[in-house]
Amino acid sequence: MSTHRTTVYRHAELARLLHPASVAVIGASTRPGSFGERVLDNLANYTGGVYPVNARYERIGDRICYPSITSVPQPPDCAVITVARDAVEQVVLDCAKAGVGGVIV
């Protein structure tokens, strides 16, 4: 007998991830061609809040860059994680602690 359970989420429970009012880019970068730089570039015309997160920078372009997801002034609805795979698990845990609505890895 299988003990596997499937959890089905309603659209309302996924709204913050699917229709975010704010997005954090964890691993944001100014390095040309890096994943963090490309994600930020793709969000250039996004009308919601964009929070670059990387302890190496104080600013990226005209945006304040936060040293960690827990230092972002309000929990973003979505976080795009662009860090090295060895750091992903801890970043996801930090996102949960910070109250992020959902993550994209």
PLM regions: where:
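Catalytic-core regions of core metabolic enzymes
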Residues: 1-105
